[in-house]
Structure formats: structure tokens, C-alpha cells
Swiss-Prot record:
It comes from Thermofilum pendens (strain DSM 2475 / Hrk 5). Phosphate binds at S12, R54, H55, S87, A88, T186. The lineage of its organism: Archaea, Thermoproteota, Thermoprotei, Thermofilales, Thermofilaceae. Keywords: Glycosyltransferase, Purine salvage, Transferase. GO terms for biological process: L-methionine salvage from methylthioadenosine; purine ribonucleoside salvage. It catalyses: S-methyl-5'-thioadenosine + phosphate = 5-(methylsulfanyl)-alpha-D-ribose 1-phosphate + adenine. This is S-methyl-5'-thioadenosine phosphorylase. Its EC number is 2.4.2.28. The keyword Glycosyltransferase applies.
């Protein structure tokens, strides 16, 4: 099995590997069951990349049913060290507008009933999540967005809810009081599993609409239009970001388990 150091998990809107050259599918078996789909290995600007659509090829897997452990394990088996997660999100702030991107730097976990760790015993891991996202990847991502003229907010707190339903207005107002900037359903447990796998993790959050706190009428047509535009923008962003990633890691992400195991 060929080794691939960079992985991409595609969210809503990013299901097809058509942004990769020389794509080929790899079927990977994991102790946690099958991943969301076969892993597609291809290239971006000459760099090998492994891609998994989080919700399956046709968005047939809801967020609370995604096999997050299998997805991360499959990418780890391929040798992935840097993982780029792409997510569609709602905005909890007036200035984070539909069509904007956010380079997430913090998260709040409001999920329930998901499987959050690879270490269910007898070995237990308590990984630090004080700074959940790789500073090296975040810096490169922000730089690429600026270069391409893509509006990207350099910081943002992502509140992850269980789904698949959306928030009530009361909940949406509460999330704003919590200090959350964007809302989605898939960041957790993806981010903590990647940390346990010693991966560098980056989340590119694409704002599709305002959450219900704003009480602004949103049509399915408008959301679909923004999502399509976001998908094309994120492909351009990935095409610029991937070749800028250095071969060797200088961050501390690979040492996440050094003092975490009991």
C-alpha cells in the first residue's frame, strides 16, 4: 500500500474527487468497520493526497452516523500526517457572512452519544485539546486564502451539535452567548481522533447561511447556490495550499500522546 502524507475529508458539497489528478480508489479495512467510502488517492500539484467524503459519495450518511474512527484509522494506515477537514457551517455572527470561510481555531462540543476515542481501555488517553488545530497548517491556509482573495476569518469557535436536526431559535441564541462563531455537526469527534492519531489537523469551515438566531428567511435555492460557490472556492484553496505544505513537520502535533497515555 502506497504511503500518502496528506489527507482531506470532504464535507457537504465536497463529495467528488474531481479536484484530484490520477485518482484511484483504495479499499481499506479497519477494526472499526468500513470508512464512509473507499479512499481515493490522487495528486494536487504533484503532491499525493488521500480523500474521503465524510457523508459518502451521495451524502447518504448523516453526521451522527459517520464512522469517524474508521475514517481516521484508514487515513492513518495510508501514512497520513496532515489532515485537512472541510465543513459546511452556519454563522452565529453578523460579520461571518454566507460565502465566507473560517479557519477554525477552537471548538465547543455539544454532541452526545458518539465514540470519541481510540483508547477505550485497558490503555487510556487524555490528550490535550487546549489548541486543537495545527498552527503550521492554519498559517499556511490563511496565507493561501489571502493570496487568492478568498474571504477567510482567521479565527472562529465552531460549536458542534449532534444533529441531524438544526437548532431551535432558543438554542441558537444560547450558542451565541457561549461565544461560538459558527455551527456545524461533524467536527467532533473527528478533531480529537486526529489528535490521538498524532495528525496535524486543519478545519476549513465554509459558511452557507446564518443560523436561525438571525431570523432571516433562507431558501434552499440560496443555500445551494452558496454551497456550490464555496465548493469551487475550496478547490482553488486546496490547490494552492497543498503544494505549500513542507515535507517535514515543525509543529508539536506528532507528540500529542507523549504525556497522554495511562
Amino acid at each position: 500500500m502506497e504511503k500518502v502524507k496528506i489527507g482531506i475529508i470532504g464535507g457537504s458539497g465536497l463529495y467528488s474527487p474531481d479536484f484530484l489528478t490520477n485518482p484511484k480508489e483504495e479499499k481499506i479495512y479497519t477494526p472499526y468497520g468500513p470508512p464512509s467510502s473507499h479512499v481515493v488517492i490522487g495528486e494536487i500539484a504533484g503532491r499525493k493526497v488521500a480523500f474521503i467524503p465524510r457523508h459518502g459519495k451521495r451524502h447518504e450518511i448523516p453526521p451522527h452516523k459517520v464512522n469517524y474512527r474508521a475514517n481516521i484509522y484508514a487515513l492513518k494506515e495510508l501514512g497520513v500526517e496532515r489532515l485537512i477537514s472541510v465543513s459546511a457551517v452556519g454563522s452565529l455572527r453578523e460579520d461571518y457572512k454566507p460565502g465566507d470561510f473560517v479557519c477554525t481555531d477552537q471548538f465547543i462540543d455539544m454532541t452526545k452519544g458518539r465514540v470519541y476515542t481510540f483508547y477505550d481501555g485497558p490503555v487510556v488517553a487524555h490528550v490535550s485539546m487546549a489548541d486543537p488545530f495545527c498552527p503550521e497548517l492554519r498559517e499556511l491556509c490563511i496565507r493561501s486564502a489571502r493570496k487568492l482573495g478568498i474571504t477567510m476569518h482567521e479565527k472562529g469557535t465552531y460549536i458542534c451539535i449532534e444533529g441531524p436536526r438544526f437548532s431551535t431559535r432558543a438554542e441558537s441564541r444560547l450558542w451565541r452567548q457561549f461565544g461560538a462563531d459558527i455551527i456545524g455537526m461533524t467536527l467532533v469527534p473527528e478533531v480529537n481522533l486526529a489528535r490521538e492519531a498524532r495528525m496535524c489537523f486543519l478545519n476549513i469551515a465554509m459558511v452557507t447561511d446564518y443560523d436561525v438566531w438571525a431570523e432571516k428567511p433562507v431558501t434552499a435555492h440560496e443555500v445551494a447556490r452558496v454551497m456550490a460557490e464555496n465548493t469551487e472556492k475550496v478547490k482553488r484553496l486546496l490547490a494552492d495550499l497543498i503544494p505549500s505544505i513542507p515535507e517535514e513537520r515543525k509543529c508539536q502535533c506528532a507528540r500529542a500522546l507523549d504525556e497522554a497515555l495511562i
